[in-house]
Amino acid sequence: MVSNQDNVQRNDVQKYPITRFVKRKSNVVLKKNKGAMKSNSNSRSRGNKKLKESQFSSRDNFRTTQTQASSSSEPSDNTNRLVPVVIIDNNTPKKEESNAEKLKLDKDSSSVNYENQISKPLITFSDIHETVNVPFLCLDKHDSKNEVAINSHEDSPVCLEDITGSLSSTYGNDSLGESNLEELPTSDKIKGENMGSRKKRKGFVIDSEDSDTGIPREENVTITRKTKLSSNILYSDSDTERQSDSGSKNVARQFSRIKRKRKVLSSSSEDDESSSPEDLLKPIIRSTEEMENLNELEQEVQDLDPIDEGFEEKVPRFRNPSKKAFYEKLHSLRNRSYSKLESLTSEKSDTLITKSELANESEEDDFIVDDEDTEVMMNARSLLPAEFSMTSHQGLKAHFRNFMMFIVQQAIDPIDASDISDHYLFSRRTIRKQLYSSVDSNIISSIWQSEFIKLIKTVPNMKSAKIDATYGCDACNIHTRMSTQIVYFKGMPYNEHNYKELDSFEPITKEAWMLGNSCFNRARIAHSIYHWEYKVSRHIQVELKFREASNTSEQGKNIVESIYEDLKDSNFFETTWVELCNLLKLASSSFESNFHSRSSM
């Protein structure tokens, strides 16, 4: 059997239909909460004891959502979110003042009486993501314009006060604090409205059910204009605090709407037009140095000669004619100073020119030197070693001239190396270094036999002939190579300093050598480089024998100079110089291709 209390609850559910809405600029849509009606009807049919447990569990869930919202800014998946929703019904009967006074919240009491709340039905307010079970609420009209009271079925009111500024909802003697409401998501907070002072706009239709028949009907709900609230909203329960806050906000809005004049800073320009009249009246403070300079300028201007009265410019430069004379005097002063500077610079340039002329004359006088002084200087230079003289910085062609003088002197009167000038010996060492270093690194092979290398360096004559191809090369001892040339070393070894044949030498054990094509070309280039000096000295000796046959007898230095001039006229030095350059190129570059091209010519 269903009790009378359950029947009363069912009638109240039909009497106060559930509609929820959120004002414009929110994410919640007006809908009927049919699921909440079904859950409430099922919970009422079970009995008072089960209804108590469900109510207590819903209240506990309600508090846990508040505590979890305060502990973390981001809601987790397990927590429910509190969504404040307004339920409106214009047909709600106005209760008596005695009942309303009994249902008010006592601020001093901190305990909550749950025994009086057992018989209340439950509804569920659904958000887009989560649901929260709260007691059944119904909205009642109120006399005040800025306050709306919300009453429940029995003695458990929930009040939504001062929608414009602060929101406080009470359930029984328990109240929702400021921290819990502030920590709700910004999209779920209800912004307040100033329902009295603002102009009302047209409302929109909300579907609801008739209180008696249960037939759906349409109602026009007026929506007031929204006011933008400040970010820092204070929530309180007292009426006095709300009035003071609203009054202070109105005053602040009025003052904020007043247009303030823009502050204009005075410009700090040097022109008279931009400066303010107060700045013009202020005295100009100058230092003592500036005052002295101004006084000197004024005195110089006064001492100047008067300007011709007949002189007039076609176009007046200044509006004030009195300033014209002053500036003309200044211009003449500047011209005088410039003329003085020009005279000083011209005098300095003249002195510099005279000094340079004197220096040139002294250099010309020093250039003329006596013969005695030259002999002393030559003797001093000869005492210097060649490495510290100018010969060490000369080019290859200068070393070649000294080297040719040395060969001519050795051909006429061979002397020991100790009696030869260091300059000639230094030039010969530089030429030999460039030739032999390239030959040892690029031409002579490391796999050649030592006896074959010794014959190339000591024996001046080498003859060759072609043979049939046979296996094996005598120079490199590679049996797979085909030998196509046979080489004969003939002649007597000679002294490297005076180019004379030696009396005692080791006999040649092997005269004929069978060589391959690559070894033959390398040996031919190396032999021509090592014995290039000997060939030049032999040519000069032939020239001396020709002169002796013609009975041209000269003595000492005159013979060396005359032979040198004759060789120079016969272009012998030029041909030997070209040959030396070609040998250096063959030794340093790819010798095979260059040698073949040279041999074909």
Swiss-Prot record:
It is found in: Nucleus. The keyword Transmembrane helix does not apply. Its main location: nucleus. Residues 24-106, 171-219, 260-283 are annotated as: Disordered. Residues 92-106 have a biased composition (Basic and acidic residues). GO terms for cellular component: nucleus. Residues 24-35 have a biased composition (Basic residues). It comes from the Eukaryota. The modification Phosphoserine is found at residues 236, 238. Residues 54-81 have a biased composition (Polar residues). Keywords: Nucleus, Phosphoprotein. PANTHER family: COILED-COIL DOMAIN-CONTAINING PROTEIN 82, PHORBOL-ESTER_DAG-TYPE DOMAIN-CONTAINING PROTEIN. This is Uncharacterized protein C17H9.06c. The lineage of its organism: Eukaryota, Fungi, Dikarya, Ascomycota, Taphrinomycotina.
